[in-house]
Amino acid sequence: MAAAALLAAVDRNQLRRVPILLLQPREWPWKHRTVKYGTTPGGSITKVLIANRGEIACRVIRTARKMGVQSVAVYSEADRNSMHVDMADEAYSIGPAPSQQSYLAMEKIIQVAKSSAAQAIHPGYGFLSENMEFAEFCKQEGIIFIGPPSTAIRDMGIKSTSKSIMAAAGVPVVEGYHGNDQSDECLKEHAGKIGYPVMIKAIRGGGGKGMRIIRSEKEFQEQLESARREAKKSFNDDAMLIEKFVDTPRHVEVQVFGDHHGNAVYLFERDCSVQRRHQKIIEEAPAPGIDPEVRRRLGEAAVRAAKAVNYVGAGTVEFIMDSKHNFYFMEMNTRLQVEHPVTEMITGTDLVEWQLRIAAGEKIPLSQEEIPLQGHAFEARIYAEDPDNNFMPGAGPLVHLSTPPPDMSTRIETGVRQGDEVSVHYDPMIAKLVVWASDRQSALSKLRYSLHQYNIVGLRTNVDFLLRLSGHSEFEAGNVHTDFIPQHHKDLLPTHSTIAKESVCQAALGLILKEKEMTSAFKLHTQDQFSPFSFSSGRRLNISYTRNMTLRSGKNDIIIAVTYNRDGSYDMQIENKLFRVLGDLSNEDGYTYLKSSVNGVASKSKFILLDNTIYLFSMEGSIEVGIPVPKYLSPVSAEGTQGGTIAPMTGTIEKVFVKAGDRVKAGDALMVMIAMKMEHTIKAPKDGRIKKVFFSEGAQANRHAPLVEFEEEEV
């Protein structure tokens, strides 16, 4: 049966929305006193509104449910069928997909809180979580804001102010400029005085937005303007500060909690050094290689920082640390962090429960001496992104999604299910995989084992990248720093990854067996004795025969000569190498598995066939093998875009630097696109003259839409 006919039978519209099994209440494997709580907070919180979406909304709802607190969700039009909407006791629409019209619309959220009789609002992280005006708005309306007072958000949210407060409190700070003169000339002058490389950062917000490393005076102006645009878009404030950039530092942060009674504690540190685009990708607790004395000094400095602003609730004090374990205050995030689960795993706490109880007026549940530190935990952030394309964020449907089974040491923190869509309007994080074990090496082995079980089809993800990262010898040794990915780029992002011929044989076997399944199904339903499907069995007249198959790895076609043997096995020849192949397909728990033997080596893989592509997932890794489609069935090829540039993803055109008639050189900036809350510069692929610009500033461009056309060059 032709591969094209087989593919036509795969209907991707028949997606099932499959729920994710989440972590059950943990039974701690180490012998230590676990804190017992009552069923409801000591204050008046019986209903909480979560002013957020995705996995953090689901996370808060689970704890609220455990405590007997009713939950209220809000959602945009894009999130109407989202997981957090289904989980909540009540859910209310608050507007269109763009965040400014929904999740950042303070008046709408306050109105929902009032109409639903919610006594408190949990902001999650991002969106309004560090918005001083929103915290004050809640207070004025008599609604409990589950977070610090607005004054603490103000003091810590403006980085220039926080640096001064920290210095006065005896917290070490980095040399830099935090002044009010925000002219380009003044900032450039101070950068020169501090000495390159420097880091410029938006004085508000976080998440790597509005942040640039500048290594020379030559690139200062371009990077400053780009950082200002991104900061203005994200935080509505383009003011900047400048700091001396510490080369190859570690990013170490401390979880703190304060209450209304003047108490403050630290729950040890997390190492979040390994980052891309200044955003964390893998975190661990405790930080590797930190001795107890440094850990104590870190924690005490973080508590001093919290007390300096009368902090209440969950917060994170971030430090940069040099190779000698000297540390310097960087900023304080006045909210619950994305990576808070690793702290929960090593301390046996529920930090969301602590938030709710402290917001209701209770004291911190444990004294500093009572907070345990046991074992080691990792969190890997699973993103819809393409690591091979500078970690370009992606969007699209989760056609297939299967995860490792949650257990007492494995958590899946997510807000999506199979069949859901990763939206272009929001952050592309799919899930957080969190694991715990008694020591770092065991936890790392658990992380890699679990990543192998995280299988996603429908859009590109960073799972394979995380496997390479967690398996790198320097990462295993704990030699982490913020330049880890650039330093080990060749190991982590190999340019040419050739699929093993044995894996190609497995893919070919899976396709052949799938063809046999389909032809058998046709045979059962046809009455036409002359139909080729009425007698197709993979063999003819009980004799061997040979066919040629073509599969594709990247842009390279692979020719496989397949001989069907009478005993049901296959001889496959790729180039000059011969393989004896046999196996079968089976269904387990709703998934198709390929059991195969290639030259006597047995293996088992999950087998998925979708959209001209074969996906194989096994404990050895994952592969994708394409099935070439005849040219007369193919859409316009990518070569048709050589005369210009195309949009790498769906987004909004923020700036246009060129017009028709302009001459440009390869690498010149043509446009700036905002997508997935990040700024992407579209650069000229070659020297030439612009013939046409297809989009103006503010316009929405779909993925692969032509942006700029070049004039044809005379030969």
UniProtKB/Swiss-Prot annotation:
Binding positions for ATP per the UniProt entry: K159, K201, G207, G208, H251, H278, E318
Stretch forming the transit peptide: 1-38
UniProt subcellular location: Mitochondrion matrix
Gene3D superfamilies: 2.40.50.100, 3.30.700.40, ATP-grasp fold, B domain
Modified residues (N6-acetyllysine): K193, K233, K490, K577
Keyword terms of this UniProt record: Acetylation, ATP-binding, Biotin, Ligase, Mitochondrion, Nucleotide-binding, Transit peptide
Pathway the protein takes part in: Amino-acid degradation; L-leucine degradation; (S)-3-hydroxy-3-methylglutaryl-CoA from 3-isovaleryl-CoA: step 2/3
Transmembrane segments: none
Segments forming domain ATP-grasp: 163-360
Modified residues (N6-biotinyllysine): K677
SMART domains cross-referenced by the UniProt entry: Biotin_carb_C
Domain called Biotin carboxylation: residue spans: 45-490
Quaternary state and interactors: Probably a dodecamer composed of six biotin-containing alpha subunits (MCCC1) and six beta (MCCC2) subunits. Interacts (via the biotin carboxylation domain) with SIRT4.
Function: Biotin-attachment subunit of the 3-methylcrotonyl-CoA carboxylase, an enzyme that catalyzes the conversion of 3-methylcrotonyl-CoA to 3-methylglutaconyl-CoA, a critical step for leucine and isovaleric acid catabolism.
Name used for this protein in its record: Methylcrotonoyl-CoA carboxylase subunit alpha, mitochondrial
Organism annotation: Rattus norvegicus
Gene for this chain: Mccc1
